[in-house]
Amino acid sequence: MTAGFIDLPEVFPLEQGGELNGVRVAYRTWGEPRAEATLICHALTGSADADDWWEGLFGLGKVFDPSRDYIVAANVLGGCSGTTGPTSRKPGRLAHFGPDFPAVSIRDMVRLQALLLDHIGVERLRLVIGGSMGAMQTLEWALMYPDRVDAIVPIGIGAAQSPWAVGLSEAQRHAIVNDPWFRSGRYRKGRGPDGGLATARMIAMCSYRSPDNFATRFGRVEQDGEGFAVQSYLRHQGAKLVDRFDANAYLTLLAAMDGYDLGRDRGPLEAVLRHAETPALVVGISSDVLYPATEVAELAHSLGNAEFALLDKPQGHDAFLIETDELNTIVAEWLQRERGRTPVVAAEGAGR
């Protein structure tokens, strides 16, 4: 694995107005550099360290096999993992952007990824893949750069951010901005809205899992001095995010997700999807309450050249990060059919 970054010399215009100077893109690569690559797009609080959070898909004979393919992942614009975002310093100044960071869109993220690929010599993408917010980027790749992409695998997403998902985003946003330490986004490092960000993560985690998953995993078990086990779990998840994420970046990315709509400024959604001819495997999750499988299946049936696959697991939306053995099989078998090549399903223990 190689870690790197590029600094764009040119001004980067943003879809919703405004521009950024001196944009930095942090990225990771695996395998030998070449003109064709696989691009992995990460979710809301993910990063370019895909071999960490998607470890089960990496290895000899698996979907991501560095001995076979050149693989790239980049931290998204607006995040806080190395690519320019609210925690970055303003050009030529000591001050950080903070709440002054401009609004970004999923399409901005994709355009920046395209510039990165130009810089490192990748001309064509054999596969673009991602789940959740990563799936939003994946689908935009097929619409924005159809001549550059051979195949896509979006996981756990519909054609636009639903009112249900926007509502959940708003609850998380409300928790952050109403924390007294938020201070209109002008908080100091180490003295920010930790409680609000932790609460936002707790809300999100409830949407990432499922009622059956919580019932099976936690039941009504109580822990000494900590209440129910599920309460302790959610508090732990909130605290973990506070240690590694920035509240302004979280708000920036939530807004980008809420603005996601494949039909926006392109015409009627039905026609936009029908004319999308990039081969696609659209994966839904049977227990997903954030992006229900019916919503994902509707997207698959509307695209011009897509198959639908169901990851039938109880963990909810996060199943794409948990049930990686089955996901690897689903994607690998589709790639085998699509490419007509040697199967890429891993043998027992391969690549571990």
Positions of the model-derived regions?
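Conserved hydrolase catalytic core segment
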Residues: 124-167
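Alpha/beta-hydrolase-fold enzymes
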Residues: 148, 154-240
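Conserved alpha/beta-hydrolase "acid-adjacent" motif
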Residues: 289-295
